[in-house]
Amino acid sequence: MNVKEKEELYRINQKSETSDLVRFHLCGTTFPDKAYTIKRPSSAVWCIEYVEEGKGTIHIDGDTFFPKAGDSYFLHVGKDHHYYSDKADPWKKHFINVSGKLVDSLAEGYGVSGTAHFVGLDLGGEIKEIIEIARRGDMDNTQELISILNKIFFKMHKSIKKEEEISGLGAEMKDFLNTQITSKFHMELLCKHISRSESQTIRLFKKIFGITPYTYVLNKKISFAKKLLIDTSLSVKEIATKLCFSDEYYFSNIFKEKAGCSPSQYRRSHEEKD
């Protein structure tokens, strides 16, 4: 073990004949340090890290990410790595640095070579297992290390697939709701459309877009109402009916809440501009 200020570092004992296949260069734990920074131009290693506490910033080949507690990140071999702790909330993280043909193949085979930041992915358990093997100083450990490394890549792969699924569902939900602007909102129709329960649907939509499906539809209705007020001569009552509000008074109250003025005031203000 090599203990630097604010870091606990281990080198892993490996048999030399396995080093071309996979080489574990370094592993350990970085403790909170607001001055912590690493620069690694054209990195010769892949870096896999899990943030246990705090947060920080990563720059990798022109892209910037902001990992926080509970996130993992995967910095690619051959790229410029620059990362550092947040000064107000410096991170505690666990890491491994690896290289070799096997790692290259795993990254490509699992489809993770294009992703650096894994939000909410906990690789802490696997990385700590590798740190413990290094701490013990075992020599005949390559197969165990490879098994753990494979678990890490599989979890990263699953995380990407989950994000792709969520992103696809998000677009599907939005597309469906966009057809409901002039209809009465029925949550059960959206749930049926994506084959999810109401609680699952609301939770998923809010995770992706930060608002509930109902709020999304309401915002869209008000945006369309603004267009109708400017571009048509429809009365407020007719617009309320067209957008399936229960009555013009409820519509006017919602409009004022969202737009900061009544529908009539909104129309007059745009007539004056013309």
Q: Language-model features: where?
A:
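Sigma70-family region 2
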Residues: 85, 159-160, 206
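Short, conserved glycine- and acidic-residue-centered signature motifs
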Residues: 44, 166, 218
